[in-house]
Amino acid sequence: EVKFHKSRNILKLLVNSDAHVEILSKSDLMVEDIGLLKEFRDLSVGISLNTLDDDFRKDMEPGAPSVQRRLNALEKLHSAGIPTYLFISPIFPYLTDIRAILRETAGNIDKVCFENLNLRGSAKKEILGYIAERYPQHLDGYKAIYTKKDTAYWTKLEAELQSMSAG
């Protein structure tokens, strides 16, 4: 993307269309295209984020921009009048502090979306191993969710999110 600007070139093709354009990225590169983004009639830009802990981010998303760069991108885009949203994904049980993320992004987002951590195939073994090594205090909780299919954590979280959105 940095070298070839594929997204920018696609956006240039769409700018005069009536297409609804929604961009979701972990990257902060779209800040460079604020002028182009402002030309769209129906556009929103989302940033994906699941932690404020940059060490955890480095473990889970080693090639992605830092947490601060993503937060800065949201602020710059929103300040420029571009509709923005936050995609908290994936939510790592017991580790993703949704309330802290929402406090940090308040005033810079127009909406928020959520997605839970889904573990399939080799990712399940890899993540459970990571949790056992780095966050052993949460391993039983992860095993309950991802081995025993216990949905209590997600049910409680969903109720909390609904309560937050109502208040």
Predicted features and spans:
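Rossmann-like AdoMet/SAM-dependent catalytic core
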Residues: L157-A159
